[in-house]
């Protein structure tokens, strides 16, 4: 089962992709937002899918970001040794943390806005981890209790802004 959101930008509704079809869950769930995950929404969703006859999403509907605007998107740069070597960078001794704007989320087929004066726009397919509830000082043994799921994330960066102008990576 895959979570989807469909409809016009800014007016997406929650749904699921199951067995090759998209189903509308908007009669049962407000959205896939932080409160959905914090209130055991995935568990409730399983019950709804098993018990209800769900309407199909009409063909041709735009597919949006599967998660409604999260509070933050945290990223780790050069997160594995092979990638650091590919870029010619030294392997970091400490994780390189930076953030992405939540307003930059798009659907899988939406246009991506490239910054004016962009010189080195780059993209990478990343595995995103969706944290389902607030966490602080969580042990490694407990970490998976906080993971709600995973998303494929097309990470688009402007490398000249990010790496050649100094400062933090956030601006890239």
Which residues make up each language-model segment?
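N-terminal non-catalytic cap/leader segment that marks the start of a structured domain
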Residues: 1-95
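Glycine-enriched loop-and-adjacent helix/strand subsegments that border the catalytic/binding cleft
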Residues: 70-172
